[in-house]
């Protein structure tokens, strides 16, 4: 097919959009691929839609290749299935909820575990029907608090979600592995650099969980890996390597000191090093206690205290993952006033446990470790408070930040931190949803068998932005051939009728050879056409200009920047050979 730019619904922009922060957002808007409608909501224009459809094609081919079957479920869903699974409340404010004219509750689907489980229950009733894997490529909806980066994090997005149903755990493991392998093929074909990391399951539930993260400095997900062992995990899933307990026999008794004006870790450390405690004190010697309130779905707010070494910040994502499915909030001034035993800046374990506040600590706070922490009175701290002797926490929690240089959980070396964008996620859900909906089928022995599920997602529209993020330069986009909106971009760079006729003929021959061609036949200057060819990002640009009269055309590689002249009579075969490798 030949796409003429003189007819194409396209308007390129020379300036970056004011709200764009990341390269992919800037370039996709400037190149006329997408347009913003509202925060987190975008229209796909012709060339952008082509790229999106190419990504969908690759995903479908690989899903079909593992025997998955495509169906399509509605995006508008009734409340009842999600209430049965508790996700009506677990999803919190991220769920788009609405009512029909009769007052019935509905939602716009974020994922479809419930509906797929019910669909299989309604259609299959025998072990002979299994295993089965179903998938869809569909628009999803999530009410993101801060949609950003264009189509990277939107409120409306295209996703491939698939669900496997097996009768045994071994079967689930096989389905999981098949999807994992398929995802590796998908991302390889799309030219995406990625890592696979261990992850948490969150509101999805289930056990085994891995994320596919595209390597990117602008990614919202932080992951760590150990170069010595290959261990890799999203920071939310990292398990802290706890030290061995220390015998506390013979340790000096804890002592309370007056520490005026020391409500922060920095001021406390400064005081300690001026107080002649017999050693140099760092923030790592202090115990910081964070107060939050938590609420289980449908429950009431309760106080929770979290103790971490003073040199560590609490990571909200890690804390949220550890508390899942409960939600949490920091305490307000009103909360402190209602609980006068909580003295801001001076909270210690003693008052927490005396008043029945659940107290969870970082795994590094093991028996025998000695700490400087609040004494529950303004302007006073306790020095030498020993875990296991002077206070006994209610348990541990993974909430402290993970840093590069921390020991790897497998003990093989140090962790290296990097950032990435989630492009895929695979879960072994188990029987969470088949239990909720009593999905039973007749087993081979005549007894009921409950299938076990896997859930597997790929961010299809997000992948368009990820590819743009990883494949661009200061001139514009550089699409991998697998997803490019065309195979060849032919530029008529001369107003001469002979050059125009030559370009038209070459484009027609390329079309007959089965290539997708963009032909820039606009009445615009060569400079404008060249800039647009670089911005649009088709991997091969063919310039038909002054050289045509001498029997030559110029072939430019958008990725390498290299250009070469080829004879006009051999241009067709050279271009086809280049495109098809």
Curated annotation (Swiss-Prot):
GO cellular component: cytosol
Keywords noted in UniProt: Aminoacyl-tRNA synthetase, ATP-binding, Cytoplasm, Ligase, Nucleotide-binding, Protein biosynthesis
Source organism superkingdom: Bacteria
Catalytic activity annotation: tRNA(Pro) + L-proline + ATP = L-prolyl-tRNA(Pro) + AMP + diphosphate
Protein localization: Cytoplasm
The keyword ATP-binding belongs to this UniProt entry's keyword annotation: yes
EC annotation from Swiss-Prot or TrEMBL: 6.1.1.15
Entry annotated with the keyword Protein biosynthesis: yes
Record InterPro entries: aa-tRNA-synt_IIb (IPR002314), aa-tRNA-synth_II (IPR006195), aa-tRNA-synth_II/BPL/LPL (IPR045864), Anticodon-bd (IPR004154), Anticodon-bd_dom_sf (IPR036621), Pro-tRNA-ligase_IIa (IPR002316), Pro-tRNA-synth_IIa_bac-type (IPR004500), Pro-tRNA-Synthase_IIa_type1 (IPR023717)
Major location category of this protein: cytoplasm
Any single GO BP term: prolyl-tRNA aminoacylation
Gene Ontology molecular function, alphabetical: aminoacyl-tRNA deacylase activity; ATP binding; proline-tRNA ligase activity
Domain note: Consists of three domains: the N-terminal catalytic domain, the editing domain and the C-terminal anticodon-binding domain.
Similarity field: Belongs to the class-II aminoacyl-tRNA synthetase family. ProS type 1 subfamily.
Assembly with partners or alone: Homodimer.
Function according to Swiss-Prot or TrEMBL: Catalyzes the attachment of proline to tRNA(Pro) in a two-step reaction: proline is first activated by ATP to form Pro-AMP and then transferred to the acceptor end of tRNA(Pro). As ProRS can inadvertently accommodate and process non-cognate amino acids such as alanine and cysteine, to avoid such errors it has two additional distinct editing activities against alanine. One activity is designated as 'pretransfer' editing and involves the tRNA(Pro)-independent hydrolysis of activated Ala-AMP.
Name of this chain's protein: Proline--tRNA ligase
Source organism: Rhodococcus opacus (strain B4)
